[in-house]
């Protein structure tokens, strides 16, 4: 099997230092628990806090004695929830997610989630991450409560920001939340990712992972512990380097990530938090493979090493660097609570690709009939924003208000080039080679107000309204598709009411009901026309969400279930043709389903886990299935956790989907079975503690079937596919100093 050698060059002194430190030791081991987040509570003030903040309770806790179901569960509901949610704690992230993985790999275990990682965990941007059939861009993703994403289409570049080692917990909220839930496309749910919490104890924790496809991860974590001289300051730093050839041929990736978090107490009631992250990626990216290529070259065919071909790996590469930072203030006094987060984030992507990497477009440029044609591009955006929340206990409840403001600037250009001649402009004059040159902005403003009414000690009602306002501006010298200039602006806004009720029947059993309206501005692509006012696609997506559910949680059993119904108007779908995503208004759709998940402690260290969903997502007019919306999902697993030993065997099934509209491009259901185990040595070795060795085997049964329609070729509209990555292995060594 041919692999990309250039992506695994020997690292310089920094990488070597990580390797030596990791071989001598490796990261601190701490079991995770979501118990604090899911424990029953009669404190309605705490229980009614915004659900996207609950993940902050998912800190790592050392498990002693017999572990409870909440401490073991890969995912679980919450007894303080007002909508369906799956809490993914620190234990699952540390034990079951690959060292190269990201949040999309972690949430793939959840009910109703369909995730495609064609090159292996975190080794390529996720091609598909759907929740209940909602595609990326139709649900919200936050980091420490801050919404982020690409304003072009509201999607998320999954490998370009935080790593699994930066992540402390995740909540998959399958619902719109209340009025205080801020972000884009909240109607499809919110994936709330929270960062690691600094420890009160000083430690240095190097780690090393290596596995299939010459995958290597070197990293080191630092916890300063509480510093009494500065009033109890704590800080966490993670520095990580990774490289892999990837599952797909010549689809290597190199990645560097630095993350830091500082928490500074100010007095007894106020805390300042500073977070900064930098990420750099160099990678080679295939667009998919035709059935003929799968049959001829195998299911892992991606790119080639032929410089005369448009799929030569050096012609199909990305250079991406990003940063994410914020300053947060939290203060609580005399019944008041104030939270404010001032943030900025950036994404800077330079990309190159062959004109038609799948071989249907012949070579030839303005310079030579045998030269290789291609394209180069840039997509660069920066956001500045602020999230402000204030609440006050008033009467029999709490009133909450605040706002989210975000201003994102974006530069996008693309040129036709001659790959053979070092990407020279493929046009005469050179200006004829310009496909697009555009700048645009998106302003988002979402003020809200809601009241949480404590009807009794065990029941509360939360009602409120949010005002969503989006303003797009474009100034294109060369507009995409038309090739002509465009200077245009458009504003969309709507009031979004919501109502949620929560009942606590016993200390172990709760239920909820929810109703809310959703709204999302059209994608930037609706401006890719001579006259955007005449475009039928220039309509916001709108929904009405209804759902009810219940949760049980005691020491031996966590169990939750829900049913939902969502009425969707102006559903925007997409189709990838020749590597270019084309959007269109599919009209209306109805989403309905049933979801459940649970964990039961059998005893003697053993627990059984399962989840499942029955989902129906259909077009209102034709009753055809919405593309990439599985009709069911399921998971079943056996977990062993006793003392220093952990092991799990978990199978995830994704049901039948259609890759395109009109019930076309059927993709069969499939199952992937993963095994993970680790052992933490009881005895220390000098200053080294919690010495740990872990192993993961993904896709045990080596299922390599087609799992996703990646798009179509530009020349002949031939379907392109991705397959499930082959069986892979990963070994991790870690320890903690001091």
Walk through the language-model features, giving the residues of each:
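Gram-negative outer-membrane beta-barrel transporters
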Residues: 32, 454-457, 461, 558, ...
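Extracytoplasmic beta-strand/coil segments of soluble accessory domains associated
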Residues: 70, 85, 95, 101-147
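Face-selective signature of the C-terminal outer-membrane beta-barrel domain
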Residues: 271, 319-352, 357-358, 366-479, ...
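Transmembrane beta-barrel wall of Gram-negative outer-membrane proteins
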Residues: 203-205, 210-243, 247-286, 316-334, ...
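C-terminal beta-signal and adjacent terminal beta-strands/loops
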Residues: 2-4, 564, 569, 603, ...
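Surface-exposed extracellular loop regions of Gram-negative outer-membrane beta-barrel proteins
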Residues: 282-284, 288-289, 293, 409-411, ...
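Membrane-embedded beta-barrel scaffold of Gram-negative outer-membrane proteins
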Residues: 220, 328-333, 337-353, 504, ...
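A beta-strand signature from Gram-negative outer-membrane beta-barrel systems
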Residues: 35, 161-205
